Amino acid sequence: MNALQSAGRSIKTVGMVVAGAGCLLIFCAIAACRQGEPVDEAAAAGLTTTDFPQITADIFKPMDGGIELSSEEIMGRNAWILWSAGNQRFWDFAARDSYGLIDLLKMLDNRKYPREQRFRILGLMNEPGFRAPGKPDKFGLWLDDQVTPEPAGIDEKVYGKPSGVIGFRLFPNPEFDEQARQQWDGGRFMHDPAYYNNRKLVRPYRVGVACGVCHVAPNPVNPPENPESPGWENLASAIGNQYINEGKVFACNVEKGGFFYEMLAAQPRGTSDTSRIATDHINNPNAINPIFLLGERERIAAREKMAGGTLDLPGEENEMNVPHILKDGGDSIGIAGAALRVYVNIGMFSEYWLTLHDKLIGLTPQKPFEIAYARKHSVYWRATAERVGKIAAFFRRLKPLHLKDAPGGVSFFTSDETVMARGKTVFAENCAGCHSSKQTPSDVDPRSPEGKAWFRTAVNDPGFLDDNFLSNDRPYPVTTIKTNSARAFATNAVAGHVWDNFSSQTYKGRAPIEGLEFLNPFDQTHRTFKPRVTTGGPGYYRTASLINVWSSAPLLHNNSLGEFTGDPSVAGRMKAFNDAIEKLLWPEKRLGQGSIWRTQNECALQLRKEFVPAILQKIAGGDGCIKIGFIPKGTPVNLIGNLEPSVGQLAVLQAKITAALTKIHAKNLSSGGATAELIKLVPELLAANKCPDFVEDEGHYFGTDLSDSDKRALIEFLKTF
């Protein structure tokens, strides 16, 4: 059955769809209701933080260049790579109740993604000491075989056992009793959708997710010969995994033919959409942050005002200096609060978190995650709070990784000292005002002639790059930066939303952004856009750090600028850097409208029947999927992905979409004819779009007016960062 026939079948039952949609709304609202006062599993079991001891052994000694760490720093690195904070409960829940998308246990099975292809396909780091399995385990799963035991000191009851993939830990499922064992079939688990989409299916393992999943990656100055088989010495703890394929990792069950498949397929490698759960109704994946020079970031941090539930976090003050990690600066309450929020965002205390928002679809309004409630009712929260200070201590030890120290790195530098000297001057006069943590005196404007003279002297100091964060860590309006605005308009941290307690009053008081113009790719006109959220907070980007810029391409906050080589060797990184930096400084080389994420196939809105109310299950096809609508090939992904219609807009859209699909079916229109009919809906779709900014590689035009020789000189200096 082709897409148009499928659309036609949906149209014949459109009355049932409309009625079912109402049931679905009620169903989701009920599912999101808070019932009683939830506590986490550890609290329910009568455990305390003493039941979750920290690991004192230097488990990962060869990593990060073999640096010597204090006992506090060792415990911090161990927690960063191993501690899942009880989120195995959330990811097991997600496998049973994510509309047939998420299943981490299946993703780890070699029948889905073989170990010898894991880095290429998924971008994940295989754990040293494992090999591909030669036979299934006792549950019929083909998980990696461990050939070298983990170092002593890891309590599997607390940290799980290794899966063969760094950051993913396996815990016995407490619900896997004798009845569950009798119903378990490892073969059907992989191949039978009706079996593995059964909400009552109990898996033998829960999978915990540690921060290392997204942050451990090949060390640029000691890359593995084979990225599918790294040694511990080839890995860096917090550089940010710019190779991860988030869609395939966290939604391995997503099926072709559905819009969600197309949306994830368009997502750049090395990016993560941390506001997909809880959703902010903007598809805004962004590059995973590297973490370096935390001490310098603390030194230059600006003061921000705190209020409300934020002050329930121990150590918070009414006003304090705040370094940031998130691109938009929404994590504005200090290191401890920012780190704890990340753990919640990946599933800690999901018993409470999931009562505050409607996961994935977001049909019900969000409620704030209250710090005071978590402190009282979650042992995992308190155990994590005991760890975040040690994690921060470890971060303070992480230094930049220089090209000159990488194998063959010196061959990529110019030997012309005049060119290098000119590059320093160009940087001083055009870049350092934003991209340096060493700044002019407070009474000197860095953009003034006096400020530029100050930077010329500073940049030529041999110690200028030492402990320089290469950013002033200040937020600027997206109207100034002009990069794609989707991440800047994230709303989860605004007042009353899920991360309300984790953003400062200073963040919430930022001036709203107005006067935006975005390209309408359908008629090539520019339209004025007024953000729906008129309160303070969204609409800003922090200055990106240029630390390790030679190793971190593609560039920009969304990894949209430059070629993704998938090659962590020095040559592979430099190929990506050279392509990206040329496109940054010579914008005529960019893809422009070619960077718009588009559907590569005709598709439909698609849900597995097992995850919807009974009234909607009747319209599922033979493949078990409910397909509604027809989305043409080449549709901008974010035309659909960023929809957040008001009630009135939803009614208009529903009527017009129904009429269009009915006409397509009645006249048996071709794919081209159907596309032409659906294009008429674009004005309504744009009006209901929370961020209709579709061109991904735009913006940051600073320095593009330099001469070619100055640009080349600047590039040479950037390689030294």
Where in the sequence are the language-model features?
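Periplasmic c-type cytochrome electron-transfer domains
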Residues: A3, A7-G15, F27-F721
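Hydrophobic membrane-insertion alpha-helices, especially the h-region
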Residues: A19-F27
